[in-house]
């Protein structure tokens, strides 16, 4: 007994009764007004109404030039009618293929003007064989022979617009041609990225503004025209090893394209058995890749990488595959298009404005020089001088083509060291 007393006397009593303090904290928390609940995740941007094409009876066409020269100009663009027009057009195309397979349009008639637009894209393909790549001894960087193709397309473009599309106004041809020519990639830097892909869509938008086709043709514009362009650019990238413009490397969605994932996710909304996780199933990719653009692009990306497995070479695609359904992915792709393409100054500072896609009042006036569609996006946002390219590439760092890595490995066997995660 004495020992128990002495032991208890030896233990110091706490100066503060923590049990009382804890009860006070609980009572205070109950008495405080409830904090407002966190808002739900940002909803996907809605598709704005697509305005009617302009009256062209007395229209003054203009050669497209860069007008986004500062953050202020970019903010003006983001609140402009042209921004709404671009969103309405791109999202309208995406909405037109929701729940539809690419092959659903296989036996459907194509309007004469859509056939003509498709013929222009096919005309570019015919030039590929005329400009073979130059042997660079296994180099994975851009092949200079691309410049010959670029120059040939620039020389032929006016003829195609006049003879195939039937556009006779030379200023209208000049305006539309600028977007088509610069949809191939950068002649100077030998690269290609989402800004060049956007140029192709703006060429299609110009033709819509010229009333060469209507919203009734949107599904065919995606399934016939865009898909043909996408496959054309794969051949261009494979032939000339175009470097990925503004690549985020392994942490990017894709080295070159964005829209296959937007259009492709829309196609798969409410699909009865293809889930987002199906992109890991090679059997489904092989069987369904020709029917759905998303699966086709994943199949292509995996085929050109030297390291196999999405989790290794495309962890962002791997992460997205964990989404509940395709509606979630479609919503996310729309948000990405707004934030990562139209919302990025390093991309949009090279966007071309003419009369059909006009600049907002108050935007900067660029020199009368045709720029070269530079569209690098960085984790360190910074603007580049509009006409200064001291290194021939952004920041002096060239990113090798991952398409080239696989191609050169196949050509030369195992003697070529693969780029990590390419």
Curated annotation (Swiss-Prot):
Compartment list: Cytoplasm
| The UniProt record lists the keyword Cytoplasm | yes
- For this entry, the protein name equals Serine/threonine-protein phosphatase 2A activator 2
Organism, as annotated? Aspergillus oryzae (strain ATCC 42149 / RIB 40)
| EC code | 5.2.1.8
Keyword entries, A-Z: Cytoplasm, Isomerase, Rotamase
Q: What are the start and end residues of every segment in region (Disordered)?
A: 1-57
GO CC term (a single one)? cytoplasm
Gene giving rise to this polypeptide? rrd2
EC top class named in words: isomerase
Could you tell me where the Basic and acidic residues compositional bias lies? 14-27
């Amino acid at each position: 007994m004495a020992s128990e007393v002495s032991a208890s006397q030896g233990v110091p009593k706490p100066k503060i009764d923590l049990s009382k303090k804890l009860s006070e904290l609980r009572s205070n928390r109950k008495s405080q007004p409830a904090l407002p609940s966190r808002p739900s995740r940002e909803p996907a941007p809605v598709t704005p109404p697509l305005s009617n094409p302009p009256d062209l009876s007395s229209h003054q066409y203009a050669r497209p030039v860069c007008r986004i020269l500062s953050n202020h100009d970019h903010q003006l663009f983001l609140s402009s009618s042209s921004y709404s027009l671009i969103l309405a057009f791109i999202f309208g195309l995406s909405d037109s293929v929701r729940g539809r397979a690419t092959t659903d349009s296989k036996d459907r008639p194509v309007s004469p003007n859509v056939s003509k637009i498709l013929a222009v894209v096919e005309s570019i393909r015919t030039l590929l064989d005329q400009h073979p790549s130059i042997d660079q001894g296994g180099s994975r960087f851009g092949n200079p022979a691309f410049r010959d193709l670029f120059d040939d397309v620039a020389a032929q473009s006016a003829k195609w617009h006049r003879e195939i599309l039937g556009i006779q106004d030379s200023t209208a041809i000049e305006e539309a041609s600028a977007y088509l020519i610069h949809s191939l990639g950068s002649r100077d830097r030998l690269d290609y990225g989402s800004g060049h892909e956007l140029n192709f869509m703006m060429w299609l938008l110009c033709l819509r503004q010229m009333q060469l086709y209507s919203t009734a043709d949107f599904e065919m514009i995606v399934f016939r025209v865009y898909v043909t362009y996408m496959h054309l650019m794969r051949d261009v990238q494979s032939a000339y090893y175009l470097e990925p413009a503004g690549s985020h490397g392994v942490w990017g969605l894709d080295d070159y394209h964005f829209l296959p994932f937007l259009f492709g996710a829309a196609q798969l909304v409410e699909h009865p058995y293809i889930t987002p996780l199906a992109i890991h199933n090679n059997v489904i990719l092989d069987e369904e890749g020709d029917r759905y653009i998303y699966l086709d692009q994943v199949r292509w990306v995996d085929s050109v990488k030297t390291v196999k497995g999405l989790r290794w070479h495309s962890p962002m695609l791997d992460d997205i595959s964990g989404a509940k359904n395709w509606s979630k992915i479609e919503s996310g792709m729309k948000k990405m298009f707004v934030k990562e393409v139209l919302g990025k100054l390093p991309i949009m500072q090279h966007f071309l404005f003419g009369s059909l896609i006009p600049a907002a009042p108050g935007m900067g006036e660029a020199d009368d020089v045709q720029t070269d569609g530079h569209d690098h996006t960085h984790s360190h946002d910074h603007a580049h001088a509009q006409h200064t390219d001291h290194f021939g590439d952004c920041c002096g760092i060239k990113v090798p083509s991952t398409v080239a890595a696989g191609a050169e490995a196949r050509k030369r066997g195992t003697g070529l060291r693969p780029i990590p995660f390419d």
